[in-house]
Amino acid sequence: MCSPEEAALLRLEEVFSATLARINSLVFQPLLEAGPEASDPWGRECLQLLQQLHSSSQQLWDVMEESLHSLRERLRRPEAVGLESLLLLQSADRVLQVHLEYIESYTCCVAVQAFQKAVKRRSEYWRGQRKALRQVLSGLSSEGSVGTALLQALRQPLAHHVQQYVLLLLSLGDTVGECHPTRELVIHAASLFGDLQSFMRQELDQATATQALWPTLSSRLRDVLCTPARRLLQDSQDVPVTVTPLRAERVLLFDDALVLLQGHNIHTFDLKLVWVEPGQDRCTFHLLTPEEGFSFCSKDPQGLVVWQWKVTQAVCQALRGKKDFPVLGAGLEPSEPPTCRCGAYTFHAEGRFCQATYEGEWYWGRPHGKGTLKWPDGRNHVGDFCQGLEHGFGIRLVPQASEDKFDCYKCHWWEGSMCGYGICEYSTSEVYKGYFQEGLRHGFGVLESAPQAPRPLRYTGHWERGQRSGYGVEEDSDRGERYIGMWQADQRHGPGVMVTQAGVCYQGTFQADKMVGPGILLSDDDSLYEGTFTRDLTLVGKGKVTFPNGFTLEGSFGSVSGRGLHTQGVLDTAALPPDPSSTCKRQLGQGVFPVESRWQGVYGAFRDFVRAGCPGDLREALLGFHVQSSRELRKSQEYLCCERTCPEDQAGRMEDLLEELLQHREPEALQQCLRKALSNSLHPLGKLLRTLMLTFQATYAGIGANKHLQGLAQEEVKQHAQELWAAYRGLLQVALQRKGQAPEEDEDAETRDLRVHSLVLPLVLPSFYSELFTLYLLLHEREDSLYSQGITHLSLFPDARLLEFLDVQKHLWPLKDLTLTTNQRYSLVRDKCFLSATECLQKMITTVDPREKLEVLERTYGEIEATVSRVLGREHKLPMDDLLPLLIYVVSRAQIQHLGAEIHLIRDMMDPLHTGGLYDFLLTALESCYEHIQKEDMRLHRLPSRWSSREPW
């Protein structure tokens, strides 16, 4: 059985559906048929509002028909169709929504008097429709305007229908009982439609108040402020309030904006960007907007409370983006607006942001968090903001005069200016990667022009207030030159070394980009000039030339146009050949550029990071970041995306990295920890190492691969290892400090050098090895060439003949190790004696670690002694006289290329702790073998013309 309430609901829906049908034919069709004049914009807008209202009415009618159908099914088959099947219960929210949409459309028409304006176009027709309208409305008087009658016709049936909904649903809830499974649905629906009644009353009141406002304003103000969706919430003419410092004549609070009227001026503030701050007393409260702040005052505390409450709730409602339901300030959402919010605003006050539109996060009236700035001239900035200024990482795009050309700055910002690390791609195709301060290049940085530029340049070094200053390296690819030295005010200034692609290099003092005073000029044939000369290498003034053969020419030099170089001086042909160290191996730059002061911009940024306590938010700004960069022309919006590696995700949080250092302090564990850190390009130590690698390659690779720079390079590698150890110590001290533990004591120089050579240098040397070893190769090219000739010659000897040639005592020959095949004699066997020692020595070139190379040499020595002991059948320690010939034999058979470069690199880079020890002894022995093989008798000794076939080998 169905309840009486369900039957009443059915009758209610039938009546309302029929009423909607009559309204459609009686009201909507005539209204929509009367089109506005073409010159009447307000008429066209009213027509659109009426069309929207008609559409909402149709949707409401359709839902009523569905509800009616569900009720009929329920009453026709009560046993089969449950109460929960009623549309009014199972889809109460949907039914509510169509009512809300109808109310919204209706109140928009009310707010702008759309009905009154539409009626005017067919006033005679509507006056004749009063009788028909009485069929729809109860209590319609014969007096009053037709517009008012239409308002009632479109509102009264709905209000009555919702009222009956509530009464019948409440009654139905009582009928079904508390235990009925559908009771909650019934109560929920009754509550919704009860709230809808309150919402409808509020909306009608606001629309009526808004409609009454417009006639009180001038036509100019009305044109600016009047929109169908806008509702008036409060007017200072109703509740007086004073606004300072603007002294507004009238204050209007709408549901989307706060409007202050001051004479002919209109000040409009988007409520989404209005912050309410209570005052110190009951007579004042403050409003904060992106560019202005106001105080609201009133002599009536109660009136001020009304204003403060309504502004606060209006801001909350605007931020939520939908009207509060059922009334303003109601609902489950917080009644206080959040201090952090998102919004868009165009700045108008004079300043850097003038005419710029900011869209993003705000905090108390200031851009704060992530956001985007766009200027009318095409400039864009995307990034982090703090208290109204660019602060943190940001990308700035600046258009240039040329079409589709932009300067793109991917940088860290501090209080509105670039500060910290950044990558800038200019419209000229230049790219700068380095540090900034107050918007200017400052600290370490690399500026590189495009390869196709008229004059391709690359500068790697230090900057000061936008200019090259301090130590730096510039490569001029067009001239084939590389300058290594000091700069000031964007010019070469101070000591410097110039290296050319042709192999010529010189050292001197520069002033304002010009060389002044005497210098040193080394040519590719090892001629040496000491004196004054010009940038184009023309000898002028007094000087001395030392030729490779030892001849010297000392005097005055000059040049005459068309006649070349001329000189007046003394040519000394009796001089002895010069010491190789004074010409061929002359090193430039040492002592002129103290190694500890060359790359302070790189070390300094890391020290600043440590001094600041290794904060995560400064990690990128001080240590740099990596982005994918391309020189290809891209659309402007694509520049605003930075595929920046996120350090927190890929390298771990700073706290985790510091914790790892604390857990690995024992020597063996520490080396593994350092290896892991240095191999990770996102770890602070790994970042520092890669920046140092960049400076090293910029100085010594390519054109810089000159033998006269080997001394500079090898001391630089040692310094980098020392600085990396200091960097590790700095991180460790921060880790201890964060844990509240006592810091480690300062190291003395001896302990520090021991740790650097044993722990750090073996780990960092591979990163610099390619460029460094190339310099050693060039420096020892002549000796290595002689050595190569020697081992090539010695390789022609069979084993027995070579042992004899090297005066190895016969009782030490390991002939019993040889296994002869048929028709083979001992005298013809080759590369079999001391094979284990030879293979061991060959492993020297498989590692770059000096200590591991020395360990290979030690094992080689052990293999030689083990072979001799096996031959003699007893333990035997080789004296130096016996060791050297055997070692020469092993070296000649190992055929290690560039052994001289290997030996000198090992000696320069080995731990000073080994000086005077076994490793030093063995390295000296190897060096003696190397020098012996270079001798003329080793290189040019002729083999016997025939071999005796009867020799008993």
From Swiss-Prot:
Gene Ontology MF annotations: GTPase activator activity; guanyl-nucleotide exchange factor activity; small GTPase binding
- Which Gene3D superfamilies does the UniProt record give? Dbl homology (DH) domain, Histone H3 K4-specific methyltransferase SET7/9 N-terminal domain, VPS9 domain
Instruction: Please indicate if the UniProt record lists Cytoplasm as a keyword.
Output: yes
List locations, semicolon-separated.
Answer: Cytoplasm
For this UniProt record, the keywords arranged alphabetically read as follows:
Cytoplasm, GTPase activation, Repeat
Q: What is its main location?
A: cytoplasm
Q: Which SUPFAM superfamilies match?
A: DBL homology domain (DH-domain), Histone H3 K4-specific methyltransferase SET7/9 N-terminal domain, VPS9 domain
Q: Where are the MORN repeats?
A: 358-380, 381-403, 409-431, 432-454, 459-481, 483-505, 506-528, 529-552
> One GO biological process from the UniProt record?
endosomal transport
Pfam entry (one): MORN
Q: Which residues form the VPS9 domain?
A: 796-942
Tell me which InterPro entries the record gives. Answer: Alsin_GEFs/MotNeuronReg, DBL_dom_sf, MORN, VPS9, VPS9_dom_sf
Q: Does the keyword 4Fe-4S apply?
A: no
Entry GO CC: cytoplasm; cytoplasmic vesicle
Q: Partners and quaternary state?
A: Homodimer. Forms a heteromeric complex with ALS2. Interacts with ALS2 and RAB5A.
Biological role: Acts as a guanine nucleotide exchange factor (GEF) for Rab5 GTPase. Regulates the ALS2-mediated endosome dynamics.
What is the name of the protein in this document? ALS2 C-terminal-like protein
What organism does the UniProt record list as the source? Bos taurus
Q: Which gene encodes it?
A: ALS2CL
